[in-house]
Amino acid sequence: MNKLTLLLLLSLAASVSLAEPVDVKVRVLANDAKFVGTSMGGAKVVITDVESGVVLASGVTKGGTGDTGLIMRKPREHGQSIVTDSAAVFNASIDIGRPTRVRVDASGPLGYPDSTAQVSATHWLIPGHEITDGWTLVLPGFVIELIDAPRKSSRGDEIPLQVKLVMMCGCPTQPGGLWDSDQYTIKGQLWKGDTMISEADMEYTGKTSHYRGVVPVAASGELEMLVYAVDTETGNTAVITSPLLVR
């Protein structure tokens, strides 16, 4: 082994020895609600080195939605944690030899692809320093599902639309509830291309998280059913669509 090769190997060994693992915890919190965990399919988390573009870790949050009282009801002082041991989390151990800027991307809930949202944030990883509760990314929106949507109809008919609307963590919505749908606007619409044909309010059915409305069919051809929900207080929104063929 020549002297140059030996020096290169020693240099490589030294750089490797300088690297040390930093444990990272990432949680995804539904906006105005609880943690996105196993019950909703979790949220995908990807941690990327900003400078090199190399993915350092990836996985899915697993665990429960957390403590409702602690997250939603109990007044908190500055810096007080809302994390409990059961709260859904993605854990990773990342080897770094120097402070490294990373981007954390989260998308979910994975069990409901029609309602998936994505958020990202940048952080610095510092060797020898771990964040006690980890990083929490806030995921906006609702999960909305169309229930038994018709595929065909005739002009002049009335289309019954029904949806299930929950928070991104799966928490229920209802009038006067903790997640109060009285402050939401929920509407059903029929579209033909870029033209809205008809619209109706969606009303609570009496069954938790379920809403329905009747939309008149005032056109023929290939239409699109659309239901949207908006909470102007929190900024949460959701849209679901389905095709409708009208003869």
PLM region spans:
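Surface-exposed loop/edge segments in extracytoplasmic proteins
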Residues: 51-58, 191-201, 236-237
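Surface-exposed, short loops/turns at beta-strand junctions within beta-sandwich domains
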Residues: 95-98, 216-222
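Short amphipathic, basic-aromatic surface patches that mediate peripheral association
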Residues: 27-37, 164-179
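N-terminal signal peptide c-region/cleavage motif recognized by signal peptidases
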Residues: 13-16
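Aromatic sugar-binding surface patches on proteins
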Residues: 66-90, 205-213
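Short, compositionally biased P/S/T/A/G/V-rich stretches that sit at domain boundaries
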Residues: 124-168
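Short coil-to-beta strand junction motifs in C2/discoidin
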Residues: 37-44, 99, 176-186
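Short acidic/polar inter-strand loop motif in beta-rich domains
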Residues: 96-117, 230-239
